[in-house]
Amino acid sequence: MVPVIALVGRPNVGKSTLFNRLTRSRDAIVGDLSGLTRDRQYGEAKWQGRTYIVIDTGGISGDEEGIDAKMAEQSLQAIEEADAVLFLVDARAGMTASDQMIGEHLRRRNKRSFLVVNKVDNLDVDLARAEFSPMGLGEPLAIAGAHGRGITQMLEAVLGIFPKDAGEPEEGAEAEEEVQEGQEAKRIPGPSEKDGIKLAIIGRPNVGKSTLVNRMLGEERVIVYDQAGTTRDSIYIPFERDDEKYTLIDTAGVRRRGKIFEAVEKFSVVKTLQAIQDSNVVVFVMDAREGVVDHDLNLLGFVLESGRALVIALNKWDGMDQGQKDYVKTELERRLFFVDFADIHFISALHGTGVGHLYKSVQAAFHSAVTRWPTSRLTQILEDAVSDHAPPLVNGRRIKLRYAHLGGANPPLIVIHGNQVDAVPRAYTRYLENTFRRVLKLVGTPIRIEYKGGENPYEGNKNKLTDRQVNKKRRLMSHHKKAEKKRKDKRK
């Protein structure tokens, strides 16, 4: 399970600054979702190959009223959601009554907490830490969030308490074994495939995720899974269809079949982000009657940035007239252009219409995401693409793209080597992405392209001459000087 870390503290102690610094490696932030995360912002971050989720909260001062009280309530809720808490204090302001109140709350909750003394730049670090040591939350960690000082030591301490998931492959691990030249493209099973394709059902509240989950598992099955753990835990349900194994990651909560139609699903951003990270393929459920809303776009953006294979399901399609259907299709084409690689299905989870067709798209998306190709195949596609549409000129020189190889899978990462690659326009990268997708027949998975510049192996090396060459050089220089002197004498 991906660790969840909450940032809490008084207002203006640097929580948002630290949040932005931690999540900058992956610009995939789900935040300010109306009515859901109004006062909490969620982001994904990576450090030394480990993924974790960060929650940024509003400040707590202890005397809140009105909207400030709501912000404090959201902060306390974030503490309950998190696996660990970074409690930020301001070294310049010193310890306050609000700091002591928050520290007391953390001690009572018995939550794994780390006291982080921020803004220690230009201060005596030892004195700053000593002032907050009596709070009883362990040895304070000193950082300067705005300048990045102390962040590495802080992350070592925090992430060190979480065991690495032995079943979670490192990014790009699927592509470590090189496909030999002349071999066909092949798929190497990942560690998760023994339990089948991990399938996450994601979507806004009340779009029909519960109904779809039960439909996929079989109408006669009453879901009574009630696993021990915190309220963040998703439910993992193995099942088979047509001799294919799947593991369904259910984020919609524990429910009984007789109640799912009346129940209002509780939406948890943490559950959603963790399910996306742990899945192989995401089935994104939307309400056809409501069309595409901003919340859908936010969640789809996170799926795209996570690199997971994607299938889109428009639910409640059967209750619409033809005019409404035509309008929704137009909106899908207009607003979902950034995930145009994903198959879209129009279904009714309640009546089962179209649900069976989802599996074919799930299988196709998964296989596209993990298939690997030899360098010769990718380089040939690159050469054909460059031949059809050459890269632009930069300062009068043509960008040269020499060869391509696979750098990772799920999602496919294609590494292209060449010269002046820093100047490749985004439009040309998009052209290459579409070309690789079309030729390799990739469906349902994002594709990423990374450039690497050519390196001159002789750069910085001096040309070493032999003794004979050195003597010859001296003779030539001496001869040149004598000839130059004779020319000057003649002019006189």
UniProtKB/Swiss-Prot annotation:
Statement: the UniProt record of this protein carries the keyword Glycoprotein: no
Q: Where is the composition biased (Basic residues)?
A: 471-492
Region feature Disordered, mapped onto this chain: 166-190, 453-492
Q: Which residues bind GTP 1?
A: 9-16, 56-60, 118-121
HAMAP family in the record: GTPase_Der (MF_00195)
All copies of the KH-like domain together span 371-455
Leader sequence segment: none
**Gene from which this protein is expressed:** der
Q: Which UniProt keywords apply?
A: GTP-binding, Nucleotide-binding, Repeat, Ribosome biogenesis
Q: Which GO terms describe its biological process?
A: ribosome biogenesis
Per the record's keyword annotation, is GTP-binding included, yes or no? yes
Pfam families cross-referenced by the UniProt entry: KH_dom-like (PF14714), MMR_HSR1 (PF01926)
Which InterPro entries does the entry mention? G_ENGA, GTP-bd, GTPase_Der, KH_dom-like, KH_dom-like_a/b, P-loop_NTPase, Small_GTP-bd
Name of the protein: GTPase Der
